[in-house]
Amino acid sequence: MLSSKLFCVLFFCLGLSNGWPQFDFMNQMGFGGGFNNGPHPNSRPGSRPNSPLGDIFGNINGMVKGITDQIGKIAQGLDVNNDLGKMAHGPPPPQSEWVEHARRFCRRFPGHPKCRGQLPQFNDIGSMLNGILVDSGKWLPKVPFINIRDPLSGINSDLKNALNGIQVQFGQISQQFANNIRNICQQMNCKQQQQKNVQMKQAILKQTVDFEKKVFGNNVADKMNLRFDRTLQLKQALLEKAQLKGVVAPEDNGVFDKDLLLTETQANFMLNELGKGGEGAIPMPGSAKAKRASIFFEQNLIQKWPSTSPIPYTFDSSLDNLDQNDVRGAISEIEQKTCIRFKYFASPPKGNHINYQKVNSPSFCGLSYIGRVEPANPVYLSFQCGNGRGIAVHETMHALGVNHQHLRMDRDKHIKVDWSNINPQQYDAFVVADSKLYTTYGVKYAYDSIMHYNAYTGAVNIAKPTMIPLVNQQANIGLLGQRAKMSNADVEILNKMYCKSAGCDDKNVYCGAWALQDLCNNPNHNVWMRSNCRKSCNFC
C-alpha cells in the first residue's frame, strides 16, 4: 500500500507544476486559515534568494515521475481511461490485455464511434480518448428523463414577480460575462487537463472503492466512474449553456464546485435542468420510464438525516489523534449550537453514517456529498490547510445538506463576481446553484458564513479578488472564506433544517426568497404564506 508520506509528497509535487501549491489552492478556497484571506505573495515559495526551500522543492520535483508511476500502478484497473492514457505512451500490450481494456471502455462509453459493432483496436486509442473532456456525454449511457415539477405552477403572479432578479436560470450568464471568459482563454490554454486533476480523481476513486469494499463488501469502481463521468458531463453542459462549448474543457477531477461529490441522482437532476435528459447512447437499466422528482430538501427526506436519533460517525484508521480531535471539535461546535446530535462508533456501523477519512493531499482541503447518501457518507479531509476543525465543520455541514453560501440564488445582490478574472476551467465553482434544489429558509446572506469561499477563489490574477462584497467591501472581503467558527446564519439554517417540530415545514422551495422580501406578513399573501411557508416565515 502506498504510504501516507508518499501520498503527501505526490500531491505536493503535482501542485508545484502549476504555481504555488498551497497558496494557489488553499487561500483561494478560503480553507487555509493561516493565510488571512488576503492577496497572494508575489513570489513563489522557495524561489526567494538563499531560501533552503528552493533546493527542497527541486529535489521533490525530481521525485515526481517515480511517484506518479507508483500511484498509477496502485490505481490500475479502477479507471479504464487512466489505464488507456498510460498505455498510449508505451508499446502495444498483449492482445488479451488490450481486449479486456477495450471491452471496459465500451461498457463505459457505449456510444463511442469505435465501439459500434466491434471492439476498437490498439491503434484507435487516440480517437478513443479524444474529445472525452469536451463532450463525453453523448457517448455515455443515456441520462434518464426526469419530470421536474415546476415549483411556481399555480403560484400567485405577485409572488412570481417577486422573484424577478433573484430566480436565475441554472447555468445562464450574460453574453458579456461569457465574452470575458473567452478573452481569458486567449491568454491561457483552457483545454489542457492538468496532471493534478487526474491524480486527484484517481486518489478519490481509490479511497472510495477501498472504503466500500472494506466496510460493505461492494466493488463500486463502475458506479464511482459513472458518478465522475456524470459530474464531468454536468460541467460540460454548464459550459455549453454559457456558449463556451469547445472553448473550455472543465477540470476532470471528479468533484463539483471544488469540494462537492455528486451522486448520480443529483447529477442527473441538474443535467435534466440543462436539457440533457435522454442524451446518451443506450438507456440505463430501469431508466426507460420517466421519473418524477422534487429534490427540494423538505420534500425529499432521503437526503435528510433523521432528527429522532443521533447521527452515527466513525473515523478511518488514516486519522491520527490530532486529526480526530479536529473532527470532534467540529462535531462539538455543531452540537453546542444546534439540536443535532452525533454518536461515535469505533468501527463502521451498518446503515447510514458519516465516515471521516484522511487523504494526504494539498490539492484539496476537504470533500463531501451534500445530504445523506447511500450506503454511507465519506468525508475526505487532508488536514493540510490550517484550521482543520473549521474545515471539518464546513464538510460536515455539506453532509447535513447545506450548500455553499456564495451560490445562493440571491448571491448577485450581495457579491459581484469578476468574470474577467476567473479560471474558465473552474466555471462550475461560480454558477449560481439550481434554484429548485436549495432554499435559504429566510436566512439572510452572511459574508462570514463558514460555507462561503474566499474572495480569491479561482482567480487568474491572484492579486485580484473574484468575489467582491457589495456591502462594506473593505470590512467584509476579509470575512469571506473564514473557517474560525460557524456564523449566526450557519447556526440558524441548521436549526431550521433539523430542529423544528413535526409539521413545521415549507411547501415551496422559494419560501425563503419570499420571506427575505418581507412577504410573510404581507396582507395580500399572509394566509397563503402561513399555510405554505411556515418554516421560512418563522410561523412555527
Curated annotation (Swiss-Prot):
Entry cofactors: Zn(2+)
SUPFAM superfamilies tied to this protein: Metalloproteases ('zincins'), catalytic domain
Limits of the ShKT domain: 504-540
InterPro entries: Astacin-like_dom, MetalloPept_cat_dom_sf, Peptidase_M12A, Peptidase_M12A_astacin-9/10/11, Peptidase_Metallo, ShKT_dom
Purpose: Metalloprotease.
Start and end residues of each Peptidase M12A domain: 293-500
Disulfide bonding pattern of the chain: 339-499, 365-385, 504-540, 511-533, 520-537
Primary gene name: nas-10
One BP term from GO: proteolysis
SMART domains: ShKT, ZnMc
Name of this protein: Zinc metalloproteinase nas-10
Active site annotation, chain numbering: 395
EC assignment: 3.4.24.-
